[in-house]
Regions:
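Helix C-cap/helix->beta junction micro-motif
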Residues: 159-161, 201-202
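Structural recognition of the beta-strand scaffold that forms the well-ordered cores
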Residues: 71-76, 96-100, 124-129, 164-168, ...
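N-terminal secretory targeting modules
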Residues: 1-75, 80-81, 85, 90, ...
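A short acidic, glycine-rich active-site loop
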Residues: 98-104, 183-188
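Oxyanion-hole/transition-state-stabilizing segment in secreted/luminal serine hydrolases
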Residues: 80-97, 101, 107-147, 170-176
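Catalytic His-Asp segment of secreted/periplasmic serine-dependent ester chemistry enzymes
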Residues: 26, 170-254
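Surface-exposed amphipathic alpha-helices with a cationic face
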Residues: 154-158
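Charged helix-capping and loop-helix junction motifs
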Residues: 142-151, 185-191
Length: 254
């Protein structure tokens, strides 16, 4: 009975989703090709909400870490996924893996943590997420829920001997497009404070990207693509901070 109810709810949701997209086509003039692309994206999201297949083939082909190599997984949302994409390389020569998925909340990250971090034999993980929770993308977003998800990921990591680095969310600004309506700056600041406190209480390394990218409360315009994502200059600021945090985390393990 419960399964039938769940299936019925999913069907109703899908119908509502399709209806909303069809309405969008009539109201915004989407072409048939654009509509099909959007429907396919929504259908994929319904099939694989947590992105379990996103890195499936890459993970399967990944060799074991070289002897003495400290594999580190950068685990997060679009801030992580976009890192190194334009240049086609991610920390060349370093045993670092990018396992970011754009648009994900920490709830989705938690579901795929085992296959995208633990199963890859990581020595350390940088957990970077929360901005999409604040924007309430796909899951309800509260500071408490983000912390619960980060705690759960940390517990899984510790149980598998993986050092944890908790990263701040990055700032936003309305310098290109409106970002602060969905991601109020005060909420981002509050979440960062909670993440910092959690890291301190738990003996974890806190990686403060936010402080290096912000001017007042705004993302520095020269360091962002659209007020949300860092540009190449922004990632250049973030890279040494991440490297320093990795050294600190791995030193704690020795």
């Amino acid at each position: 009975m419960a399964v039938r109810r769940s299936a019925a709810c999913a069907a109703v949701f899908l119908v509502a989703l399709v209806a909303s997209v069809l309405f969008a086509q009539t109201s915004s003039g989407l072409s048939a090709a654009e509509l099909e692309q959007r429907l396919n994206a929504y259908a994929h999201l319904l099939r694989d909400w947590a992105g379990l297949t996103r890195y499936g083939s890459e993970n399967a082909e990944l060799p074991a870490p070289a002897a003495g190599a400290d594999r580190v997984v950068f685990f997060g949302d679009q801030i992580t996924e976009a890192w190194g994409r334009s240049a086609g390389r991610f920390f060349p020569g370093k045993p670092y893996l990018n396992r970011g998925i754009a648009g994900q909340t920490t709830a989705q990250m938690l579901v795929r943590f085992r296959q995208d971090v633990v199963a890859l034999h990581a020595k350390a993980v940088i957990i970077q997420g929360g901005t999409n929770d604040i924007a309430s993308l796909f899951t309800p977003g509260t500071e408490a829920l983000v912390l619960d998800n980060v705690r759960s990921m940390t517990e899984i990591a510790k149980a598998n001997g993986i050092r944890v680095i908790v990263a701040s969310v990055t700032p936003v600004c309305d310098c290109v497009t409106d970002q602060t309506t969905t991601r109020p700056q005060g909420k981002l600041i509050g979440l960062n404070g909670a993440l910092r406190d959690y890291a301190a209480e738990s003996g974890l390394v806190f990686l403060n990207y936010y402080a290096a990218l912000v001017n007042g409360r705004d993302f520095k315009p020269e360091l962002t693509v659209d007020g949300l994502l860092p540009n190449d200059a922004g990632y250049a600021v973030m890279a040494p901070l991440a490297e320093e945090a990795i050294v600190r985390a791995l030193d704690k393990a020795r």
